[in-house]
Amino acid sequence: MQTLADLLNTIPAIDPAAMSRAQRHIDGLLKPVGSLGRLEALAIQLAGMPGLNGIPHVGKKAVLVMCADHGVWEEGVAISPKEVTAIQAENMTRGTTGVCVLAAQAGANVYVIDVGIDTAEPIPGLINMRVARGSGNIASAPAMSRHQAEKLLLDVICYTRELAKNGVTLFGVGELGMANTTPAAAIVSTITGRAPEEVVGIGANLPTDKLANKIDVVRRAITLNQPNPQDGVDVLAKVGGFDLVGMAGVMLGAASCGLPVLLDGFLSYAAALAACQMSPAIKPYLIPSHLSAEKGARIALSHLGLEPYLNMEMRLGEGSGAALAMPIIEAACAIYNNMGELAASNIVLPGNTTSDLNS
């Protein structure tokens, strides 16, 4: 049986030769060089992913939503009742939540995965990977054991790889869990080295008079648990949550297949920071969908070296931003595969040389 270390070692490097070929191809299309901006860069990035075999394309699309409760909810860091996690997860099975509507619009399937919802019985219609009924309260204990974190990572990686075997070529990550912006902020603070007050935001409309308590909870969690910022698993286990671990697993699993994964908002940035500590090789496979309105978003993205494609002032989570950005990926593939070539039209533009076009 493969271990987590075994799977991390399978993550392939991006193919620079394929990216160079894609650059020459795109420069020879019916347009001035660089005139489609970041869409061109995205197509070239996709061409370098081994799982796409040098040709940017989209097969099946999937948004994986990791659902879990958090013991830190007891600290008064969220105004929504904890039961909302289970209620919204059930609503996802009916296709009525934000991510479900946006994913349907994008032609993507939504996989709702219970990795730690606090209910007595599993919720019908959810994929059951539950580790426990919620994580530990990070203000007074670790979120989980390292063994639990590693096992969940491995389970989600394997599940993601199985979806890839069944034709999924574009993944999106999402989450659901009351109070989960608190552990996310703790992860971002730990790995970036920024102070809690710089990264803690209001989450799901936390009143501003409760923000000081949330900042204090994050500070206490880091001080108590002493997560090692160089060890992504340690950070997730000590100050994270099962939903954050699950998202990191999707990223690692997609990258191990040489396939792209769309990030969502602040929670996914935190998971990505931890995943990149485990394997920096995954970074070229991460595509930032949108700029979360949550405080600390820019800090996390800057540390990742990523610039989001959309700025919609969204902070819903669920994978809503990932679903919304899927047509951008398809657009990048479309220009690469369907545009005509300058050479075939006898057009010569500055910056488009004959040697470029015929290489």
Curated annotation (Swiss-Prot):
GO terms for molecular function: nicotinate-nucleotide-dimethylbenzimidazole phosphoribosyltransferase activity. Pfam families: DBI_PRT (PF02277). GO terms for biological process: cobalamin biosynthetic process. Its EC number is 2.4.2.21. It catalyses: 5,6-dimethylbenzimidazole + nicotinate beta-D-ribonucleotide = alpha-ribazole 5'-phosphate + nicotinate + H(+). The active site is at residue 318. It comes from the Bacteria. InterPro entries: Nict_dMeBzImd_PRibTrfase, Nict_dMeBzImd_PRibTrfase_bact, Nict_dMeBzImd_PRibTrfase_N, Nict_dMeBzImd_PRibTrfase_sf. Pathway: Nucleoside biosynthesis; alpha-ribazole biosynthesis; alpha-ribazole from 5,6-dimethylbenzimidazole: step 1/2. Keywords: Cobalamin biosynthesis, Glycosyltransferase, Transferase. HAMAP family: CobT (MF_00230). Catalyzes the synthesis of alpha-ribazole-5'-phosphate from nicotinate mononucleotide (NAMN) and 5,6-dimethylbenzimidazole (DMB). Belongs to the CobT family. Homodimer. This is Nicotinate-nucleotide--dimethylbenzimidazole phosphoribosyltransferase. It comes from Escherichia coli O139:H28 (strain E24377A / ETEC). The lineage of its organism: Bacteria, Pseudomonadati, Pseudomonadota, Gammaproteobacteria, Enterobacterales.
